[in-house]
Amino acid sequence: MYPAITPLQAGLQWWAVAGRQGVAELWQVQVETAADGADGEVEETLYWYLSELGLPHVERQILAGRLVLRGYLSGETPEGVMERWREHIRERLTQKAEIGWYAVERRDWQAAWREQWRPIFVGERLVIWPVWLPDPPGDRLVIPLDPGMAFGTGEHATTRLCLRALESVPDLGTFADVGCGSGVLTVAALKLGAGRGWAVDTDDLAVVSTRKNLEISGLEERVTVARGSTEQLSGPLDGVVSNILAEVIANLAPEFRRLVHPGGWGIFSGLLLTQAPRVVEALAGQGFALSETLSEGDWACLVGRFSADRPRSAGS
């Protein structure tokens, strides 16, 4: 029996997996564990193992007190690899988890998810508008988007939180988008008044998608797009937005401090509410002053500014 997934969910995964590898079959990988015992560390461990397996995106749900994480792989994944991967996770988790994989029914997911995807209205001023739909509204700033195979369609809470946060910054100026995905945050920042941007991502497909969406909006001359991370960027900038993983944000905190001038803004998401204190601590050690925590469901977005004070060294 095939698992129940929406055309939008499967369509995005088809683009990210089958579209990339030239296959038309998908396997759904599912990890399930007790929600009341799954603290931020356990959940982040599961995300890490799923990403190591090669899942480009992971869906998260709480169903009847159970934490359920799902992702999709091409149908060419050997069963033996999956068996070894399952045992590897079970040996390292501190609580019991059910791990399985299932064949997903073959169909034209690309057409199906286009039929299902609708405009996404965010905050007070923005709307993400699929490029294949006619007549965008005239009362909002339109972000025309063709997501391709990259993350960031507005379907995920962290993308929406970052967009709301960008709306709240009075003078965006120059900025960097670290982990740009589809480029939706880069386009939004420019539409909201930013002057010039730099967008980086370690995924080649994200770089291609960001460039394409900038061209759709006629903004390609105002953004430098590169494959990589903060090593591709130079400061000082007026601000930085980064919607990636909690651990990565914490590790990059010194780099964000290097890039943003004193008084500059920072918007950080891709983290759970339970992970926020740890990330705030890492950023605060680099002079970041938290002004607001936005939330949607279990997801958080940190908004604040970098102070003029240099971070303290150990023992000072």
Curated annotation (Swiss-Prot):
It comes from Gloeobacter violaceus (strain ATCC 29082 / PCC 7421). It comes from the Bacteria. PANTHER family: ELECTRON TRANSFER FLAVOPROTEIN BETA SUBUNIT LYSINE METHYLTRANSFERASE. Its EC number is 2.1.1.-. GO terms for cellular component: cytoplasm. S-adenosyl-L-methionine binds at T159, G179, D201, N243. One of its GO terms (molecular function) is protein-lysine N-methyltransferase activity. It catalyses: L-lysyl-[protein] + 3 S-adenosyl-L-methionine = N(6),N(6),N(6)-trimethyl-L-lysyl-[protein] + 3 S-adenosyl-L-homocysteine + 3 H(+). HAMAP family: Methyltr_PrmA (MF_00735). One of its GO terms (biological process) is methylation. Signal peptide: none annotated. Its main location: cytoplasm. Belongs to the methyltransferase superfamily. PrmA family. InterPro entries: Ribosomal_L11_MeTrfase_PrmA, Ribosomal_PrmA_MeTrfase, SAM-dependent_MTases_sf. It is found in: Cytoplasm. CDD domains: AdoMet_MTases. Methylates ribosomal protein L11. Keywords: Cytoplasm, Methyltransferase, S-adenosyl-L-methionine, Transferase. This is Ribosomal protein L11 methyltransferase. It is an enzyme of class 2 (transferase). SUPFAM superfamilies: S-adenosyl-L-methionine-dependent methyltransferases. It holds the Pfam family PrmA.
